[in-house]
């Protein structure tokens, strides 16, 4: 049986044993540091990815204080740095605030019931009772004696009583009204003298007619004479 041939040492594979070749060369300092095997492992502070993007662009480490936070200008740090504890409970830093003005008590300078036992009627004098306010703008109603005597006669006959409101149009005459013109508003258009005499004549005739209906022709004639002191002239043709 032939003995196995031995290969020269130069022909041996390099990966069989690297310890014989000596220690491996060290990595260059400029080469990036490899990431840790696990993404949960803490990243070393000198790793280039640990720095912020702006710091990497500037190629310098970030300015940090002892707590590890970024430094701020003194003006910004003075205003934005939170104070320890509750800021609302701390005393003011710059001077003392002016003393608050004492709120004026309502009883000071006023007449109270304890100091003045008499009731204060200062505010009640201007108020007027309700029945007076309802009738203060109306004129008092005066009923003439002649109207009272007529009402007593009408009560005996069972007729409705007369009111003291003066009415130019008798109750038994029909007066058509337009829906836009009220009876209490006077007409604004001018009236000629002929129409005025005609209206007076018709009014006197209506008063005479109502006086005869009520059974007192003399009173009807008197009221007609009062309404028309002069005899009507002949109507002019329009």
UniProtKB/Swiss-Prot annotation:
Lineage: Eukaryota, Fungi, Fungi incertae sedis, Microsporidia, Unikaryonidae
Biased composition (Polar residues): 129-152
Protein's UniProt name: UPF0328 protein ECU07_0010
Species assigned in the record: Encephalitozoon cuniculi (strain GB-M1) (Microsporidian parasite)
Similarity remark: Belongs to the UPF0328 family.
Taxonomy, superkingdom: Eukaryota
Residue segments, region Disordered: 1-154, 211-238
Residue ranges with Basic and acidic residues bias: 106-128
